[in-house]
Design a protein with these regions (language model features):
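A composition/biophysics-driven feature that prefers long, compositionally simple stretches
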Residues: 1-157, 171
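Short catalytic-site patches enriched in acidic/histidine residues
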Residues: 27-32, 129-132, 138, 171-229
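Generic secondary-structure signature for well-ordered alpha-helical cores
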Residues: 120, 149-159, 163-170, 179-188
Length: 229
């Protein structure tokens, strides 16, 4: 959070309102139905300016958001989401005098428009999508450790495919063997991708004629995919 606050300050942005589920998980520790306000370093609402610092406004579940953020050891405030027409006033009482930036490159326009209107008394909301990406692209030591651990799981997935593979085994059966390893290690089953409208499966195995069929996915692997026929 301090690093992000510094990046906001360097970009000349007073603060950020984060709402993309993946980024809520990264900055707040969970992905409840919420919006997280992070003030720029030294800007209104920041601790340096006499404010209370970052705050997570939660619609539901407040109790789970507190738990996921560390409960009594939470590095930010966790509050009930106020009424939208009172949102700018709530932020103003926290010392915020300029509209925070929104993730226009991530969330649907109809969703962001609601916040643009609600925050309009504080001014125009800039786009902070690139600032978020700038921090997320630099992986922490912990993230690097998790990537190495994930690579070990991936290796065991390949070994599972090798163990069950043979004549007459379908591509879906091979994928199931690989994903069984992934799920047993705690994978939730979904890979979130920022680029709309891409989606990604944990395992894709293609062979024969199916292997030569292209798809919309930005990858060398296509295939027919699962279908009723």
């Amino acid at each position: 959070l301090p690093i992000f606050g510094r990046l906001l300050s360097e970009a000349g942005v007073a603060g950020a309102m984060l709402q993309h589920p993946v980024d809520l998980y990264y900055y707040a520790g969970g992905r409840q139905n919420a919006s997280m306000f992070i003030p720029a370093q030294g800007a209104g609402g920041s601790i340096e300016a006499g404010g209370n610092g970052p705050v997570l406004f939660v619609r539901r579940s407040l109790q789970r958001a507190l738990f996921e953020a560390g409960d009594s050891d939470c590095p930010h405030e966790v509050l009930v989401f106020p009424r939208m027409k009172e949102f700018s006033e709530v932020l103003n009482k926290r010392g915020v005098i300029s509209a925070p930036g929104l993730q226009f490159g991530e969330v649907p326009k109809t969703y962001s428009d609601r916040f643009v209107n609600a925050l309009s008394p504080l001014g125009d909301c800039p786009d902070i999508t690139g600032i978020v990406h700038a921090q997320r692209e630099v992986k922490s030591l912990w993230e690097q450790e998790q990537m190495n651990a994930a690579a070990d799981v991936q290796l065991r997935m390949f070994e599972a495919v090798q163990a069950v593979g043979g004549e007459g085994i379908t591509e879906l059966e091979l994928v199931a063997a690989a994903e069984a390893v992934s799920r047993s290690e705690g994978f939730g089953g979904h890979i979130h991708m920022r680029r709309f409208p891409l989606q990604c499966d944990r395992g894709v195995i293609v062979a024969g004629r199916a292997g030569g069929i292209p798809s919309f996915f930005d990858s060398a692997v296509g295939g027919t995919g699962a279908h009723p026929l």
